[in-house]
Amino acid sequence: MDAKKLILVGGGGHCKSVIDVAESAGFSILGILDIPENVGKTVLSYPIIGTDDNIPEYVDKALFIVTVGHIKDPNLRIKIHERIETAGGRLATLISGTSHVSKYSSIGEGSVVMHQAVVNADAKIGKGCIINTFANIEHDAVIEDFCHISTGAMINGN
């Protein structure tokens, strides 16, 4: 498997933003998995090639990233992550080329750090997190698994 090939799971608005981050990070997007009625359509010229039922077909071909946003409730994102892991898939971690991530911080698998976000020294980001555009995670902050830090949010250090 080429470590820079990527399958996106979820074809809505958040998917569009993640496409931009994935491209800036040098990933090659093979396609998108979404709901059945969207198969055959495109998102920013990338094809919707199947549904999450097709995850097992791609575990040896690409890494995965969940591109379902759901700010209020992470349960759908958690279920998709679990489905990928159960199938033997690996989750990518995407970091925008325009963000700043301290070498002293840690970012969990399946997380996305969007454009212009800042993750400072000794901050810890869990798995499956969304650190959205212009969010600022200061020193020593801990963001648990599957949290969505919204656009422009500021999380101060200790």
Segments and roles (model prediction):
Residues 1-43, 49-52, 56-57:
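Hydrophobic, well-ordered beta-alpha structural blocks that scaffold small-molecule cofactor pockets
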Residues 11, 35, 51, 68, ...:
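Fold-independent oxyanion-binding glycine-rich loops
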Residues 13-14, 72-75, 106:
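Short alpha-helical
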Residues 19-21, 77-80, 125:
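Short amphipathic alpha-helical segments
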Residues 25, 81-84, 129-131, 147:
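Glycine-rich, phosphate-binding/catalytic loops in enzymes
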Residues 39-100:
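Phosphate-bearing ligand-interacting subdomains
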Residues 94-157:
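Structural signal for interior beta-strand "rungs" in well-ordered beta-sheet cores
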